[in-house]
């Protein structure tokens, strides 16, 4: 692979600088540490990247904006929607480092959309389409959009050659120009062989660490879930590794064996707590990634999620800003779980609530008082009939109970299947809240 020296140097400088002065984390605790504009108080808007459904409204993927401020007259209502003019399996999105733009991708058509959410977050504008991913990289299915200084790091799920799970990461600048690509390793590193699969991305600048996880390719995620689970060969085509990369050089340094499709990655955010946690979809386990006494990264399963024998299918997770708690959604049984992470070596489930017939994404406010859930996983994996609920549900959390705040029925409102959420605040209020560093 050809390495761009200028890119490496920029990564080096960014990483070195941010070890000493890390930019603020934003509202949802899964966002990049390089993002500016921390919302410490009440978020004003929730943006939902939504899958289009044939015959429902205009049938297009769209960005839906909901008023989330209880002081507003339109609290809990859809106040804006912008369609992209087609269906490409809308899935995830991420802010640029300046928090002014949202990049959102389609897992099927690999189109990337850039929305201006900084000028007027109540009415985002679609300003750019990027359709060069497959041609420039050979990857398809852009999943994770992770801000770096002046750059967007994109983790993909599949490849254009055979639509399998071998894939990689790509880097674009904030203007939408392609910069570089990095294949997921398939070689053996430190006695563990890579499977080449990809999914999530998460960075710990203080440890010069970039951690990736693994899922499955287009052939599986665009196929009916019932068919996949009944096909023994298809079930072999899920990721079983995580990769620790050197953030400065963007080279893989260690492969961790984590069987069962490790999905979302969440680093502990308080200074000095240099560990990460993930959940495996197929085996329903929480896994801790942490250095041992020798300074070598290790991954170990530390807790079961629900009853693994019933395959509840853990999907999204959200860590609290103090790293003492973790929300976990299990899709098949529609349950939202809360784990006490006071001892990350031994997480304890202390609360659970049935929140829908199916539930997928979870986002929480920085103070942990508000929790938002959406229902859709993938268009071909969602349930059918009466169990095909499509919603955003907002809750208040007092440390003991989730209390409903408001709900949007996306089917009734002819919007589609809601997936990923991001928060914004009005520019005037956001400006007064910036400048606060996590560390």
Language-model features: locations:
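Asp-box/WD-like beta-propeller blade repeats and closely related beta-sheet repeat scaffolds
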Residues: 118-205
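Short, conserved, GDST-rich strand-edge loop motifs in beta-rich repeat architectures
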Residues: 41, 47-58, 155-166, 213-237, ...
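Blade-loop segments of beta-propeller domains
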Residues: 75-144
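Loop/turn-rich, solvent-exposed surfaces of beta-rich toroidal or solenoidal domains
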Residues: 309-392
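Beta-propeller domains
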Residues: 96, 191-339
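A short beta-strand motif characteristic of beta-propeller blades
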Residues: 78-84, 127-135, 178-191, 251-256, ...
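Short loop/turn segments immediately following beta-strands, especially the blade-tip
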Residues: 66-73, 114-124, 171, 175-177, ...
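Beta-rich, blade/repeat-based domains predominating
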Residues: 29-37, 58, 85-97, 135-150, ...
């Amino acid at each position: 692979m050809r390495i761009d020296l200028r890119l490496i140097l920029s990564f080096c400088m960014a990483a070195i600088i941010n070890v000493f002065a890390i930019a603020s984390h934003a509202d949802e605790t899964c966002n990049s540490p390089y993002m500016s504009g921390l919302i410490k108080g009440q978020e004003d808007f929730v943006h939902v990247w939504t899958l289009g459904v044939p015959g429902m409204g205009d049938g297009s993927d769209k960005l839906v904006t909901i008023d989330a401020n209880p002081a507003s007259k339109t609290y809990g209502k859809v106040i804006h929607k912008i369609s992209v003019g087609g269906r490409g399996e809308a899935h995830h999105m991420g802010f640029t480092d300046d928090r002014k733009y949202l990049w959102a991708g389609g897992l099927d058509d690999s189109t990337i959309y850039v929305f201006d959410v900084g000028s007027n977050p109540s009415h985002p504008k679609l300003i750019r389409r990027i359709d060069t991913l497959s041609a420039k990289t050979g990857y398809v299915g852009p999943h994770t959009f992770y801000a770096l200084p002046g750059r967007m790091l994109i983790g993909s799920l599949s490849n254009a050659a055979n639509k399998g799970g071998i894939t990689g990461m790509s880097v674009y600048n904030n203007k939408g120009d392609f910069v570089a690509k990095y294949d997921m390793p398939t070689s053996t590193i430190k006695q563990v062989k890579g499977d080449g699969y990809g999914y999530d991305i998460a960075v710990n600048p203080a440890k010069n660490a970039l951690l990736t996880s693994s899922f499955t390719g287009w052939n599986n995620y665009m196929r009916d879930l019932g068919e996949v689970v009944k096909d023994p060969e298809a079930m072999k085509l899920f990721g079983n590794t995580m990769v620790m990369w050197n953030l400065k050089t963007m080279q893989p340094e260690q492969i961790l064996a984590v069987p069962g499709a490790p999905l979302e990655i969440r680093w502990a955010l308080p200074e000095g707590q240099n560990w990460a946690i993930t959940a495996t979809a197929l085996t329903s386990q929480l896994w801790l990634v942490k250095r041992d006494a020798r300074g070598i990264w290790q991954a170990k399963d530390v807790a079961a999620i629900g009853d693994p024998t019933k395959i509840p299918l853990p999907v999204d997770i959200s860590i609290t800003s103090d790293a003492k708690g973790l929300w976990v959604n299990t899709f098949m049984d529609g349950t939202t779980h809360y784990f006490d992470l006071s001892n990350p070596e031994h997480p304890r489930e202390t609360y659970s609530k049935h929140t829908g017939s199916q539930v997928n994404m979870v986002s929480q406010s920085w103070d942990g008082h508000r929790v938002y859930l959406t229902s859709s996983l993938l268009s071909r994996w969602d349930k059918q009939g009466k169990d095909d609920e499509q919603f955003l549900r907002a809750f208040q959390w007092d440390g003991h109970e989730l209390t409903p705040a408001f709900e949007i029925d996306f089917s009734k409102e002819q919007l589609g299947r809601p997936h990923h959420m991001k928060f914004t605040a009005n520019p005037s209020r956001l400006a007064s809240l910036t400048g606060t560093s996590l560390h």
